[in-house]
Protein backbone atom coordinates (compact mmCIF):
# COMPACT_ATOMS: atom_id res chain seq x y z
CA UNK A 1 0.00 0.00 0.00
CA UNK A 2 1.33 3.41 -0.94
CA UNK A 3 0.50 6.62 0.89
CA UNK A 4 -0.32 9.56 -1.34
CA UNK A 5 0.28 13.21 -0.58
CA UNK A 6 -3.51 13.61 -0.27
CA UNK A 7 -3.61 10.87 2.38
CA UNK A 8 -0.89 12.66 4.34
CA UNK A 9 -2.69 15.98 4.10
CA UNK A 10 -5.82 14.31 5.49
CA UNK A 11 -3.78 12.94 8.37
CA UNK A 12 -2.52 16.46 9.08
CA UNK A 13 -6.09 17.82 9.01
CA UNK A 14 -7.18 15.21 11.55
CA UNK A 15 -4.47 16.53 13.91
CA UNK A 16 -5.27 20.19 13.29
CA UNK A 17 -6.63 20.83 16.79
CA UNK A 18 -3.40 19.54 18.27
CA UNK A 19 -1.41 21.82 15.96
CA UNK A 20 -3.51 24.81 17.07
CA UNK A 21 -2.97 23.83 20.70
CA UNK A 22 0.78 23.45 20.17
CA UNK A 23 1.03 26.89 18.57
CA UNK A 24 -0.91 28.57 21.40
CA UNK A 25 1.13 26.65 23.97
CA UNK A 26 4.47 27.66 22.45
CA UNK A 27 3.61 31.37 22.32
CA UNK A 28 1.08 31.54 25.20
CA UNK A 29 -0.99 33.81 22.99
CA UNK A 30 -4.24 33.11 21.13
CA UNK A 31 -3.66 36.22 19.00
CA UNK A 32 -0.14 35.16 17.96
CA UNK A 33 -1.34 31.63 17.18
CA UNK A 34 -4.11 33.04 14.98
CA UNK A 35 -1.56 35.12 13.05
CA UNK A 36 0.81 32.19 12.54
CA UNK A 37 -1.95 29.80 11.47
CA UNK A 38 -3.81 32.34 9.31
CA UNK A 39 -6.97 31.94 11.40
CA UNK A 40 -9.22 34.33 13.24
CA UNK A 41 -8.79 34.48 17.00
CA UNK A 42 -12.34 33.14 17.61
CA UNK A 43 -11.50 30.15 15.37
CA UNK A 44 -8.44 29.40 17.50
CA UNK A 45 -10.53 29.66 20.68
CA UNK A 46 -13.10 27.29 19.18
CA UNK A 47 -10.44 24.67 18.37
CA UNK A 48 -9.01 24.84 21.89
CA UNK A 49 -12.46 24.53 23.50
CA UNK A 50 -13.24 21.51 21.31
CA UNK A 51 -9.96 19.85 22.29
CA UNK A 52 -10.62 20.54 25.98
CA UNK A 53 -14.06 18.97 25.64
CA UNK A 54 -12.61 15.91 23.89
CA UNK A 55 -10.03 15.42 26.65
CA UNK A 56 -12.21 16.48 29.56
CA UNK A 57 -9.55 18.83 31.01
CA UNK A 58 -8.69 22.52 30.93
CA UNK A 59 -5.52 23.21 28.96
CA UNK A 60 -5.09 26.95 29.52
CA UNK A 61 -5.74 29.41 32.33
CA UNK A 62 -6.69 32.83 30.94
CA UNK A 63 -7.28 34.65 34.23
CA UNK A 64 -5.59 37.95 35.01
CA UNK A 65 -5.18 38.89 31.36
CA UNK A 66 -2.42 36.30 30.83
CA UNK A 67 -2.43 32.91 29.14
CA UNK A 68 -0.71 30.11 31.05
CA UNK A 69 -0.67 26.35 30.65
CA UNK A 70 -2.44 24.25 33.23
CA UNK A 71 -0.68 21.17 34.57
CA UNK A 72 -2.59 19.06 32.03
CA UNK A 73 -1.78 21.55 29.27
CA UNK A 74 1.96 21.35 30.00
CA UNK A 75 1.82 17.55 29.79
CA UNK A 76 -0.08 17.64 26.50
CA UNK A 77 2.32 20.22 25.02
CA UNK A 78 5.27 17.95 25.73
CA UNK A 79 3.58 15.11 23.85
CA UNK A 80 2.35 17.43 21.09
CA UNK A 81 5.96 18.25 20.26
CA UNK A 82 6.80 14.55 20.12
CA UNK A 83 3.79 13.83 17.90
CA UNK A 84 4.73 16.64 15.49
CA UNK A 85 8.25 15.25 15.20
CA UNK A 86 6.96 11.72 14.56
CA UNK A 87 4.47 12.92 11.92
CA UNK A 88 7.30 14.76 10.18
CA UNK A 89 9.46 11.62 10.18
CA UNK A 90 6.60 9.49 8.82
CA UNK A 91 6.05 11.92 5.96
CA UNK A 92 9.73 11.85 5.08
CA UNK A 93 9.79 8.04 5.10
CA UNK A 94 6.65 7.60 2.99
CA UNK A 95 6.59 10.48 0.53
CA UNK A 96 7.82 9.41 -2.91
CA UNK A 97 11.06 10.72 -4.29
CA UNK A 98 14.52 9.62 -3.31
CA UNK A 99 16.19 12.05 -0.93
CA UNK A 100 13.08 14.24 -0.65
CA UNK A 101 12.66 15.75 2.81
CA UNK A 102 9.50 17.50 3.94
CA UNK A 103 7.95 18.51 7.22
CA UNK A 104 9.70 20.54 9.91
CA UNK A 105 13.31 20.57 11.08
CA UNK A 106 13.14 21.81 14.68
CA UNK A 107 16.70 22.97 15.29
CA UNK A 108 18.24 24.52 18.40
CA UNK A 109 21.55 26.34 17.97
CA UNK A 110 23.70 28.13 20.51
CA UNK A 111 24.40 31.78 19.88
CA UNK A 112 27.89 31.85 18.36
CA UNK A 113 27.20 28.94 16.01
CA UNK A 114 23.87 30.50 14.98
CA UNK A 115 25.53 33.79 14.06
CA UNK A 116 28.75 32.71 12.39
CA UNK A 117 28.66 29.04 11.34
CA UNK A 118 25.04 28.01 10.81
CA UNK A 119 24.36 30.26 7.77
CA UNK A 120 27.16 28.47 5.90
CA UNK A 121 25.54 25.12 6.70
CA UNK A 122 21.89 26.00 6.18
CA UNK A 123 22.37 27.70 2.83
CA UNK A 124 23.48 24.46 1.21
CA UNK A 125 21.25 22.11 3.24
CA UNK A 126 17.99 23.97 2.56
CA UNK A 127 18.88 24.35 -1.12
CA UNK A 128 19.08 20.56 -1.30
CA UNK A 129 15.80 20.12 0.61
CA UNK A 130 13.56 22.91 -0.63
CA UNK A 131 10.37 21.32 0.76
CA UNK A 132 11.66 21.35 4.31
CA UNK A 133 10.41 23.93 6.81
CA UNK A 134 12.84 25.24 9.43
CA UNK A 135 11.91 26.02 13.02
CA UNK A 136 15.03 27.64 14.50
CA UNK A 137 15.65 28.41 18.16
CA UNK A 138 18.83 30.08 19.45
CA UNK A 139 20.20 30.71 22.92
CA UNK A 140 23.14 29.75 25.08
CA UNK A 141 24.20 26.13 25.49
CA UNK A 142 22.13 25.47 28.62
CA UNK A 143 19.01 26.89 26.96
CA UNK A 144 19.41 24.69 23.87
CA UNK A 145 19.83 21.54 25.96
CA UNK A 146 16.65 22.38 27.87
CA UNK A 147 14.77 22.88 24.58
CA UNK A 148 15.96 19.44 23.50
CA UNK A 149 14.91 17.81 26.77
CA UNK A 150 11.46 19.41 26.53
CA UNK A 151 11.12 18.15 22.92
CA UNK A 152 10.82 21.67 21.50
CA UNK A 153 13.73 20.90 19.18
CA UNK A 154 14.73 17.53 17.73
CA UNK A 155 18.46 18.22 17.37
CA UNK A 156 20.88 20.94 18.44
CA UNK A 157 24.29 22.47 17.83
CA UNK A 158 26.05 23.69 20.98
CA UNK A 159 29.38 25.22 22.02
CA UNK A 160 29.88 23.84 25.49
CA UNK A 161 29.60 20.50 27.28
CA UNK A 162 26.19 19.00 28.05
CA UNK A 163 26.40 16.96 31.23
CA UNK A 164 22.81 15.70 31.35
CA UNK A 165 22.58 11.91 31.08
CA UNK A 166 19.55 12.17 28.80
CA UNK A 167 21.54 13.68 25.92
CA UNK A 168 24.49 12.62 23.80
CA UNK A 169 26.97 14.80 21.95
CA UNK A 170 29.18 14.38 18.89
CA UNK A 171 32.02 16.73 17.97
CA UNK A 172 31.56 18.15 14.48
CA UNK A 173 33.99 21.08 14.33
CA UNK A 174 36.92 22.47 16.30
CA UNK A 175 36.82 26.12 17.28
CA UNK A 176 39.54 28.32 18.69
CA UNK A 177 38.66 31.11 21.10
CA UNK A 178 41.10 33.98 20.67
CA UNK A 179 41.82 36.98 22.85
CA UNK A 180 41.07 40.22 21.00
CA UNK A 181 42.06 43.82 21.63
CA UNK A 182 41.92 47.17 19.88
CA UNK A 183 44.99 47.49 17.59
CA UNK A 184 46.07 50.92 18.87
CA UNK A 185 46.56 49.51 22.37
CA UNK A 186 49.52 47.49 21.04
CA UNK A 187 48.71 44.30 22.92
CA UNK A 188 50.23 41.92 20.32
CA UNK A 189 51.62 39.79 23.15
CA UNK A 190 50.54 39.97 26.77
CA UNK A 191 52.50 38.84 29.78
CA UNK A 192 50.51 37.14 32.51
CA UNK A 193 50.80 40.20 34.75
CA UNK A 194 49.58 42.56 32.04
CA UNK A 195 46.67 40.27 31.24
CA UNK A 196 45.59 40.23 34.89
CA UNK A 197 45.86 44.03 34.96
CA UNK A 198 43.39 44.26 32.05
CA UNK A 199 39.60 44.39 32.12
CA UNK A 200 38.36 41.02 30.87
CA UNK A 201 35.08 40.87 28.94
CA UNK A 202 33.31 37.50 29.27
CA UNK A 203 30.02 35.88 28.31
CA UNK A 204 27.24 35.23 30.82
CA UNK A 205 26.84 32.10 32.95
CA UNK A 206 25.23 29.28 30.98
CA UNK A 207 27.17 30.19 27.85
CA UNK A 208 29.38 27.49 26.36
CA UNK A 209 32.03 30.13 25.62
CA UNK A 210 32.10 31.21 29.28
CA UNK A 211 32.57 27.63 30.48
CA UNK A 212 35.41 26.92 28.04
CA UNK A 213 37.23 30.21 28.75
CA UNK A 214 37.04 29.76 32.53
CA UNK A 215 38.33 26.18 32.29
CA UNK A 216 41.25 27.20 30.03
CA UNK A 217 42.19 30.12 32.27
CA UNK A 218 42.17 27.90 35.35
CA UNK A 219 44.34 25.32 33.60
CA UNK A 220 46.83 28.12 32.84
CA UNK A 221 46.80 29.28 36.47
CA UNK A 222 44.35 32.19 36.19
CA UNK A 223 41.20 32.89 38.21
CA UNK A 224 38.53 35.36 37.11
CA UNK A 225 38.62 37.01 40.54
CA UNK A 226 42.34 37.74 39.99
CA UNK A 227 41.65 40.11 37.08
CA UNK A 228 41.56 43.85 37.61
CA UNK A 229 37.94 43.88 36.45
CA UNK A 230 35.54 41.44 34.80
CA UNK A 231 32.53 42.55 32.76
CA UNK A 232 29.81 40.06 31.76
CA UNK A 233 28.12 40.51 28.37
CA UNK A 234 25.40 38.42 26.75
CA UNK A 235 26.73 38.00 23.21
CA UNK A 236 29.87 37.81 21.10
CA UNK A 237 28.82 40.96 19.26
CA UNK A 238 28.62 42.83 22.57
CA UNK A 239 32.15 41.70 23.47
CA UNK A 240 33.50 42.80 20.07
CA UNK A 241 31.83 46.21 20.35
CA UNK A 242 33.15 46.70 23.89
CA UNK A 243 36.68 45.78 22.80
CA UNK A 244 36.50 48.18 19.85
CA UNK A 245 35.41 50.89 22.29
CA UNK A 246 38.52 50.24 24.39
CA UNK A 247 36.74 48.79 27.43
CA UNK A 248 39.07 45.82 27.69
CA UNK A 249 40.04 42.51 26.10
CA UNK A 250 37.87 39.47 25.52
CA UNK A 251 37.78 35.93 24.17
CA UNK A 252 35.65 35.26 21.09
CA UNK A 253 35.39 32.53 18.49
CA UNK A 254 37.85 32.82 15.62
CA UNK A 255 34.80 32.49 13.33
CA UNK A 256 33.42 35.78 14.68
CA UNK A 257 36.23 38.15 13.71
CA UNK A 258 37.03 37.58 10.02
CA UNK A 259 35.77 41.00 8.91
CA UNK A 260 37.17 42.93 11.87
CA UNK A 261 40.65 41.46 11.36
CA UNK A 262 40.57 42.23 7.62
CA UNK A 263 39.46 45.82 8.34
CA UNK A 264 42.05 46.30 11.08
CA UNK A 265 39.38 47.05 13.70
CA UNK A 266 40.55 44.27 16.02
CA UNK A 267 43.65 42.16 16.47
CA UNK A 268 44.38 38.81 18.05
CA UNK A 269 46.50 38.90 21.20
CA UNK A 270 48.83 36.05 22.12
CA UNK A 271 49.22 35.08 25.78
CA UNK A 272 52.15 32.85 26.63
CA UNK A 273 51.05 29.35 27.56
CA UNK A 274 47.37 30.01 26.88
CA UNK A 275 45.49 28.39 24.02
CA UNK A 276 41.72 28.09 24.20
CA UNK A 277 40.06 25.49 21.98
CA UNK A 278 36.76 23.67 22.05
CA UNK A 279 34.62 21.41 19.93
CA UNK A 280 31.28 22.44 18.51
CA UNK A 281 28.86 19.62 19.27
CA UNK A 282 25.80 18.03 17.71
CA UNK A 283 23.44 17.24 20.60
CA UNK A 284 20.49 14.84 20.52
CA UNK A 285 18.43 12.73 22.91
CA UNK A 286 19.83 9.42 24.13
CA UNK A 287 18.23 6.52 22.26
CA UNK A 288 17.90 5.74 18.56
CA UNK A 289 19.94 7.98 16.27
CA UNK A 290 18.00 10.97 14.89
CA UNK A 291 16.07 10.13 11.74
CA UNK A 292 14.14 12.09 9.14
CA UNK A 293 15.06 15.76 8.83
CA UNK A 294 17.02 15.75 12.10
CA UNK A 295 19.04 12.72 11.02
CA UNK A 296 19.74 14.19 7.59
CA UNK A 297 20.90 17.48 9.10
CA UNK A 298 23.13 15.66 11.60
CA UNK A 299 24.86 13.73 8.82
CA UNK A 300 25.16 16.86 6.70
CA UNK A 301 26.67 18.91 9.55
CA UNK A 302 29.22 16.23 10.42
CA UNK A 303 30.33 16.01 6.79
CA UNK A 304 30.12 19.68 5.80
CA UNK A 305 32.00 20.93 8.87
CA UNK A 306 35.23 19.42 7.53
CA UNK A 307 35.03 21.67 4.46
CA UNK A 308 34.24 24.75 6.57
CA UNK A 309 37.26 24.12 8.80
CA UNK A 310 39.51 23.81 5.75
CA UNK A 311 38.11 27.06 4.32
CA UNK A 312 38.74 28.85 7.62
CA UNK A 313 42.34 27.64 7.86
CA UNK A 314 43.04 28.77 4.28
CA UNK A 315 41.53 32.20 4.99
CA UNK A 316 43.40 32.54 8.28
CA UNK A 317 46.78 31.85 6.67
CA UNK A 318 46.07 34.31 3.84
CA UNK A 319 45.08 37.06 6.28
CA UNK A 320 47.74 36.40 8.91
CA UNK A 321 49.61 39.68 9.57
CA UNK A 322 53.34 39.78 9.10
CA UNK A 323 55.08 40.44 12.39
Annotate the PLM regions.
Residues 117, 269-311, 315-318:
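A late-sequence structural motif
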Residues 22-40:
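Short helix-boundary/capping micro-motifs
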Residues 168-205:
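Flexible hinge/capping segments at coil-to-helix
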Residues 52-71:
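A short LG(V/I)-centered, amphipathic sequence patch enriched
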Residues 102-165:
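Central regulatory/effector-binding core of bacterial HTH transcription factors
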Residues 17, 54-55, 76-98, 160, ...:
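Alpha-helical linker/hinge and terminal dimerization helices associated
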Residues 140-145, 149-153, 158-159, 222-269:
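Hydrophobic hinge/microswitch elements
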Residues 200-222, 290-291, 308-316:
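Secondary-structure junction motif
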